[in-house]
């Protein structure tokens, strides 16, 4: 309760500072900016917020401008380092600017025109509070008459391309009755381009798709024609070559694990599962892991998605510094389609690393020292496994009255060993399923020995877990196959626990002997788009972001079944492991 009160006081102090403290005389703080859309219920005002060129300072919890409050805690003398430091922590006040307001209005008008509205008018309503030196701005959007698609026609002379397009009619977004939205036109162009490039058309580009819009004077109806153009010939005037788009098939896949090797280096090429793998003397990656991480295969129709998935899977391997994929022509097929060779170039990073930490302490004259070392091996068994070993120790002497205590010093020794595999370590899973997700398998072992004046405590643990995500990282799952936590206090003073945790059961439990062997599952889902999935139209509104997290676990049930089946004796009405009662829930 005391912490909440202290936090509330801090919030009141920061927000209580004058918000116009650093607003120059004659200027106004932009206090609020809103958008009102009239006579167009289908347009949400919040979808237009990204077009504003000036917005007020950010509010926390919808009412407190904490960052502005921090900035206002600084003095007016910007030559002092303290004032500059405080200002960097906060956010400068947003000063109302007529030019930016006009620019925002122009951007809103252009956005509405692109969405299919004509005769768009943007009115700016400004309310000035001279006493408080603040300004509020409201943009009133009057969309005018919407332009509606009356007819939509796809002109595709190539029968194979036409079949690909109309086999996926459910994804077509341009339909009669919809708005003549320029953003939707570009989205449809991008969708069709991706569709073609995933069906073998390696050289297909957005420029091969054009739109012809026919609008009658005085009418809001639009007849739209999408034209899928033939490719331009490499030789001007060669009409035979320009008759149709060519499909591309992968002839061979070459994986060069020594992309940085000099031309004089001795390299060997082996065939493994259809791949030409080029190795140096070390052969630092086994063929099996390359096979699992590669989505390109000989004889396969070119697919841009498979190229992206190969990039993502290979960059997951910590031993690799960078990955590059290129394609080269490899001749023609009898039917006129093309063949290409895939060249996957891998550059090796550092295999091992070590980090040392040192620290010294002085607590009321009691000197102490601590040291830690971390060792990493990024390719333990040539599958890009990550081995991490951490060892840490600390010591602090004690002075003064030590009567009634069991130790005359603070000491701590700990070790942690973790191994992470960049795939599912489960032989029953087929390659097809393992390639559908980004997965890892983790093992960890921990041990910590503590000596304090009041107690000696041993903490140990071990675990194995699986983690897997979908490609877009919007769904994440963690399955703790086993997680063991062991706490044992061989020595402690008589009233130690009652002294430190008289009313806190959780803190008390952490200082009592216990053994937990649990199994758990965690599911996480969000609609937040990944950072790399940015649209060409950054101002297109995104849906409200949500996250969902679910966790379930159980502990002790397997131990109980084993104890019951083997006839183990109960102690004080409960089963024990290593003389310690285990948790069950």
Give the location of each predicted region.
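Sec-dependent signal peptide recognition
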Residues: 2-7
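Interaction-mediating elements
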Residues: 18-316, 322-328, 339, 432-433, ...
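Short, flexible loop/turn elements at secondary-structure junctions
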Residues: 126, 143-145, 230-232, 329, ...
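C-terminal motif of bacterial Sec signal peptides marking the signal peptidase cleavage site
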Residues: 13-16
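Transmembrane beta-strand segments of outer-membrane beta-barrel domains in Gram-negative
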Residues: 198, 353, 402-585
